[in-house]
Regions:
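Active-site rim beta-loop-alpha module in soluble metabolic enzymes
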Residues: 2-3
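Conserved beta-sheet core of the metallophosphoesterase superfamily
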Residues: 6-79
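A short C-terminal boundary segment appended to hydrolase-like catalytic domains
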Residues: 65-116
């Protein structure tokens, strides 16, 4: 499913609650801090984030992206070359029913840091 906005992703989580181990969004590239196990046992996170350089525009070259906003001459999008972050989710599932017991997100390297 394609979920552009957070409310669509939350709705998808509830649709699959109890039927899937995990529902995770990815489209916005920015990690959210709302990981939880839903009422019927599905792990949920609105957005896991991206694997890429956060000192950029969603992983792409910053100046080229800004030029596109102002319709200035720009090259095709190309990846930023800064230090990358690896963002993701770890889910602990019940081996008997396949549903989530616990969900944790992580951020490793780069500009972003986990907030305790």
């Amino acid at each position: 499913f394609h979920g552009e906005i957070t409310s669509e992703k939350v709705a998808i989580g509830h649709i699959f609650d109890g039927s899937a181990t995990l529902v995770v969004g990815t489209h916005t590239h920015i990690p959210t801090n709302d990981g939880r196990v839903l009422n019927k046992g599905t792990g949920y996170l609105t957005d896991a984030g991206m694997c890429g350089d956060y000192d950029s525009v969603i992983g792409m070259n910053t100046q080229n992206s800004i030029n596109k906003f102002f319709k200035k001459d720009s090259l095709k999008h190309f990846p930023s070359e800064g230090e990358a972050s690896l963002c993701g989710v770890i889910v602990e599932a019940n081996p008997k029913n396949g549903l989530a017991n616990k969900i944790d997100s992580f951020i490793y390297g780069g500009e972003l840091k986990n907030i305790s």
